[in-house]
Amino acid sequence: TKSFILLKDGKIVLEKYFNGHSDTSSWYWASAAKTITSFLIGMAQEEGYLEITDTSSNYLGNGWTNCNPVQENKITIWNQLTMTTGLDDNVSDPNCTNDNCLLYFSDPGSRWAYHNAPYTLLRPVIENATGQGINIYNYQKLLNPTGMTGLFLYNGFNNIFYSKSRSMARFGLLILNNGNWDGNQIMTDTNYFNQMLNSSQSLNESYGYLWWLNGKTSYMLPGSQFVFNNELIPNAPVDLVAALGKNGQIINVVPSQNLVWIRMGDNPDNSLVPYTFNKEVWNYINDLACTSLLVEDYNEKSKRKLIKITDFLGKSVNPISNIPLLYIYDDGTVHKKIILE
């Protein structure tokens, strides 16, 4: 792990950096940045530059795939957002955006397949629709209003976003607050925003517009057509929405808990979508059952026994002045306390 930030009620309650990383270091988002692209598509539609029901050829030109014209014109921006283009993801390089790599497999909307190339081509869709480079449009519509920083850069066929960790956390807060930042409603198209964070099709219920969704009855994963009859992350809240990228680039947003957490770093597993690692992190978050001790019920709870005192990494310590520590009691409650000198 390079960085981990946990926010509750809009405030940072845990921020840690590791392995030479700091709050000034930039790192790549991998596929977690698909969610930024989804947001920008919504902004472009809101401003009248495009409609997600438009054929993608309107913005990519004719012959952007190896399909015949009838097949190609059926592919829409919506299909690119939902991974339902029908293009063959089993080609030798599924990241390749050249027309000879984009082969017909099935009709658009009939098959869900995690395919990077059609997603990557949303960048020129945005650029051609708005007449602006992706970084200029992103700065105007997202970065500047929220105080985020970052940059999209091409690496081969891949369109990769780099930012500092707090910028990733800011994006999570924006989503938590329904597209509102400090009273400024950045995305006013509530229909698009809600569609973005809900099941976009019935093939993979756990996928919105490039966002992963928890609490559904089934899910599919990259590289497979198998349907798992379970929630994506069973130990997490059902209203969790997630941005998931290769090597464990993660944003989790939980409206019911007013909670956001992000993780940047190196490879925790070999998955394009680190959902297993995401589950492991929730095992630890679920142990953080912090509660408030009210003055009026102090006497009632004063009989409980203190089990141990730990730091925020779970290491047992002795009381230290001016350092926030966790006091763990035998009734399962955990309190953060600071002993002042």
Could you tell me what each predicted segment is?
Residues T1-H21, I251-N252, N258-I262:
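A short, well-structured edge-of-sheet supersecondary motif
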Residues G10, W27-T53, Q80, L122-I126, ...:
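Active-site SXXK
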Residues E47-T85, Q132-K164:
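Active-site helix/loop module of the DD-peptidase/beta-lactamase fold
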Residues W64-P94, L102, D107-P108, A117-T120, ...:
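Conserved catalytic neighborhood of penicillin-recognizing serine enzymes
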Residues S106, G147-P255, P268-L272:
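Penicillin-binding protein/beta-lactamase superfamily catalytic region
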Residues L272-S292:
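Short, gly/Ser/Thr-rich active-site loops of penicillin-recognizing serine hydrolases
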Residues C290-S316:
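Residue-level detector of functionally pivotal "anchor" positions at catalytic/ligand-binding pockets or at interdomain
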Residues P324-E341:
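C-terminal tail/sorting-segment detector
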